From Swiss-Prot:
ATP binds at residues 126-181. This is D-alanine--D-alanine ligase. It comes from Clostridium kluyveri (strain ATCC 8527 / DSM 555 / NBRC 12016 / NCIMB 10680 / K1). Belongs to the D-alanine--D-alanine ligase family. The gene is ddl. Coiled coil: none annotated.
């Protein structure tokens, strides 16, 4: 089977995507698959470059990767691909819509507002919500242009930074707690990881992708809490109609999990969370890639 590794792209996460793509190429079973590296530099590239492949392994991140657009292209071209449907991808990429769905399903998530311009900032509401808050692009990823703000005077500058990356900006109540993530592969929860950033105060871009940027360890909580985290993660999987593989990021405060977001195309670099979680149940990187392909077909 000829597998195209789709990487690069046009988003701010291009570098991360290229690293994911290289890792996938290095670890994919070359005895089982014919691997075709496909670097996307502009949107039209996809039509020409993917013509002869049997399966698209999407290693893109951000816009034109995780937002459902390239998934729609592959569906139109009758090419099976890794991960979620266009609809699920688009909804999960939009943090505001995702949080509205989480809220409607009684899944804990931090309080938030979403703004479309600087003039939209409701300082009175933010005062009631309470500081600190997190300011970030509504449809961004990899914590690009994400800032923790302690006081109202600094909101505008952080919002302007985030508006460089998206047309909408989310301002979310900052919950101080332990960062955890639950990776789900084909509807099965893998070991939970706890994330301890060594660089920066939260799991930002540097923590995620720099060597030594963070420490991620498999954790097992007491049974009731462990079950609760897994149950919430699987509820998210069902709620958003996920497929293939997804990562559910959370903050744990006073033994209460708050869902931050769902990642429908989790990073697959050597520093990424998904391979580390899979390794916790003795699934090698090569086996993980094979399982992703099989459950996405």
């Amino acid at each position: 089977m000829k597998v195209g590794i789709i990487m690069g792209g046009i988003s701010s996460e291009r570098e991360v995507s290229l690293n994911s793509g290289k890792s996938i190429i290095n670890y994919m079973d070359k005895n089982k698959y014919e691997i075709v590296p496909i670097v996307i530099d502009k949107k039209n590239d996809v039509f020409e470059k993917v013509k002869d492949i049997d399966f698209a392994f999407i290693a893109l991140h951000g816009k034109f990767g995780e937002d459902g657009i390239i998934q729609s292209v592959f569906q139109t071209m009758d090419i099976p691909y890794s991960g979620c449907s266009p609809l699920t991808s688009g909804i999960c990429m939009d943090k505001d819509i995702s949080k509205k769905l989480l809220y409607s399903a009684n899944i804990n998530t931090a309080e938030w507002i979403c703004i479309k311009s600087i003039e939209n900032i409701d300082y009175d509401y933010l005062e009631k919500m309470g500081y600190p808050v997190v300011v970030k692009p509504n449809s961004g990823g990899s914590s690009v242009a994400t800032t923790i703000i302690e006081k109202s005077e600094d909101i505008e500058e952080a919002a302007r930074l985030a508006f460089n990356y998206d047309e909408e900006v989310m301002i979310e109540k900052y919950i101080e707690g332990d960062e955890i993530t639950c990776c789900i592969l084909d509807g099965t929860a893998l070991p939970i990881l706890a994330i301890k950033p060594n660089k920066g105060s939260f799991f930002d871009y540097t923590s995620k992708y720099a060597d030594g940027g963070s420490e991620e360890i498999v954790v097992e909580f007491e049974k009731p809490l462990q079950s609760k985290i897994e149950e919430i993660s699987l509820k998210c999987w069902e709620l958003f109609k996920c497929k293939g593989y997804v990562r559910v990021d959370m903050i744990l405060k006073d033994k209460v999990p708050y869902v931050l977001e769902l990642n429908t195309l989790p990073g697959l670099t050597k520093n990424s969370l998904f391979p580390k979680s899979a390794n916790g149940v003795n699934i090698s990187f090569t086996e993980l890639l094979d399982k992703i392909i099989q459950c996405s077909m």
